[in-house]
Amino acid sequence: MNGVLIPHTPIAVDFWSLRRAGTARLFFLSHMHSDHTVGLSSTWARPLYCSPITAHLLHRHLQVSKQWIQALEVGESHVLPLDEIGQETMTVTLLDANHCPGSVMFLFEGYFGTILYTGDFRYTPSMLKEPALTLGKQIHTLYLDNTNCNPALVLPSRQEAAHQIVQLIRKHPQHNIKIGLYSLGKESLLEQLALEFQTWVVLSPRRLELVQLLGLADVFTVEEKAGRIHAVDHMEICHSNMLRWNQTHPTIAILPTSRKIHSSHPDIHVIPYSDHSSYSELRAFVAALKPCQVVPIVSRRPCGGFQDSLSPRISVPLIPDSVQQYMSSSSRKPSLLWLLERRLKRPRTQGVVFESPEESADQSQADRDSKKAKKEKLSPWPADLEKQPSHHPLRIKKQLFPDLYSKEWNKAVPFCESQKRVTMLTAPLGFSVHLRSTDEEFISQKTREEIGLGSPLVPMGDDDGGPEATGNQSAWMGHGSPLSHSSKGTPLLATEFRGLALKYLLTPVNFFQAGYSSRRFDQQVEKYHKPC
């Protein structure tokens, strides 16, 4: 993760772990690349500041709610409060980072001095002409993109790298061109190639939506055969795909990146086209700004050689009292409220999840025997039911048809079937169900004859949810045990009621009222009637 918590401030940039955010209260996103959005998801519930393009992509692709996204115009200064009473404020200015669509640098100004966070950026001399950087401001801390901060790594400019790609394509006039890209970035390169070779560039629907948002030239399509230049995911550029593509049409692949990649096929070409500043560009940028200190953004990479370009360091700023209260309160009260809000908004699990009939049909006989032995080992014998309570996750005393006036009607009842956890609105399979006489009115005579039901079941036993209410589990599971036991006041379910219970558990109430049958449910019944 490439993000920072700026010390002695409530500011966090590209940092989305609330557990480690401490006193951070203001969150900023530089761009939408995945290494800068680790921990950011649809559950995010705090104000977040970014550029308008990033705001659109953030809501579109990560489903972050719009109520938390604050889009700030690029090139303009914005005043934000640093406490709860508006006594202390700071100014933040967004500058184009020349990295990918929507990427920006953040210039923070406040009691802490002046801080510039570059994020990922590709330096150009025109950046020094930004009004926010030309007013003689002293940069106290420069958070620098040090991805390519290595004197041994020499990179061409993007114009030079683009020229190399054009020359390579010209050497293969009859070939299809596969250009491997990440999910965001290098759209301007694709536009340049399309205009250079007067051909359509084939994109995925997702990237096409992006280029339309950027307002680029109308040179992109999703039709596979419309043009010979195809933008694909960089992971698709591999040896096996090269063989497959060349079987139908001569194809070369281009990876525009500064990373060291071993080419697994002679037609895969790596061109050092980078959206990160080269070492020489970083040196020029730091020398022009003369910050008091340089802090690398990518902690795993080296970042040195700037000592001769630094200004004298200043002392640690004093945090105003109102800001201290603002920062300390953010680590306690909001976190508790945020957790409560998330719990209240959590969707209630409803419905039934069944095991796939195809999966059950594909089980081997050995697996079924193993499950049968396990059930026999775990299931108590009828004679033991009086001596020990049921240890099944549920001890249910529930009507076959739910009481519409009961408060429990909307509650999901968890149960386990075939070692899979599911939820159900009625009593689970493998348990006797306590029927009441009022249930009989739901069952028509035609339905009784269809499922082989004789006389109605007479309810007996206690109504207090004790051990008697659990019934005879062995009789339901079909282990050949007697269908009754010595416990007094326990409802007895004969063999013919197995089809009834299964059908009613798997079938909604309106199914019986309609008076028709379902082949899928019959298959479920046949499966459970088959001997193990």
UniProtKB/Swiss-Prot annotation:
Pfam families from the xrefs?
Answer: DRMBL
Q: GO:BP terms for this protein? A: double-strand break repair via nonhomologous end joining; interstrand cross-link repair; protection from non-homologous end joining at telomere; telomere capping; telomere maintenance; telomere maintenance via telomere lengthening; telomeric 3' overhang formation; telomeric loop formation
Q: What is the effect of changing residue 35 to N?
A: In Apm2; abolishes exonuclease activity and function on telomere maintenance. In Apm1; abolishes exonuclease activity and function on telomere maintenance
Alphabetically list the UniProt keywords.
Chromosome, Cytoplasm, Cytoskeleton, Disease variant, DNA damage, DNA repair, Dyskeratosis congenita, Exonuclease, Hydrolase, Isopeptide bond, Nuclease, Nucleus, Telomere, Ubl conjugation
Enzyme class (EC, first level)? hydrolase
Q: What is its EC number?
A: 3.1.-.-, 3.5.2.6
Enter cross-link residues for Glycyl lysine isopeptide (Lys-Gly) (interchain with G-Cter in SUMO2).
333
What is this protein's function per UniProt? 5'-3' exonuclease that plays a central role in telomere maintenance and protection during S-phase. Participates in the protection of telomeres against non-homologous end-joining (NHEJ)-mediated repair, thereby ensuring that telomeres do not fuse.
What disease association does UniProt give?
Answer: Dyskeratosis congenita, autosomal recessive, 8: A form of dyskeratosis congenita, a rare multisystem disorder caused by defective telomere maintenance. It is characterized by progressive bone marrow failure, and the clinical triad of reticulated skin hyperpigmentation, nail dystrophy, and mucosal leukoplakia. Common but variable features include premature graying, aplastic anemia, low platelets, osteoporosis, pulmonary fibrosis, and liver fibrosis among others. Early mortality is often associated with bone marrow failure, infections, fatal pulmonary complications, or malignancy.
| Free-text note on domains in this protein's UniProt record | The TBM domain mediates interaction with TERF2.
Also noted in the record is: Was named 'Apollo' in reference to the twin brother of 'Artemis' in Greek mythology. Artemis/DCLRE1C is a related nuclease.
Q: What is this protein called?
A: 5' exonuclease Apollo
What is the organism field in this record?
Homo sapiens
Tell me what gene encodes this: DCLRE1B
